Amino acid sequence: MVASDEAIDDAGFHLESLDKTRIGVIWGAGIGGLETFQNEVLNFAAGDGTPRFNPFFIPKMIPDIAPGMISIKHGFQGPNFATVSACASSANALIDALNYIRVGHADVMVCGGSEACITIAGVAGFNALHAL
């Protein structure tokens, strides 16, 4: 959220004068809510086997929450989705945003990315890939 706020401020747009149906958000995520997934699975495994998951499990886990929250905060109503393509996610978000503007589907796009899969599963998985 902070990175998107700073990008919007740095762009110098006067958002109140723009058509918010023509402003979109595309945000990259390498994996998504890995910490949420890991915690829910560990809590389930430690229990009695009864499937008890947090009702916010899915919304906290899916990568589309980030662009959705950015749009909600600023009232943007244009294209909105996340790209999930590992280490290329943010680059893909930038390319997609450029193309949305080029073909006329939006006038302004907020784009970027974020990731922090610093969990047991994330570190072990990347270690197994010899990517650390």
Regions flagged by a language model, labelled:
Residues 9-19, 27-132:
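Acyl-thioester C-C bond-transforming condensing/cleaving domain
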Residues 1, 24-28:
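Short, conserved beta-strand segments within well-ordered enzyme catalytic domains
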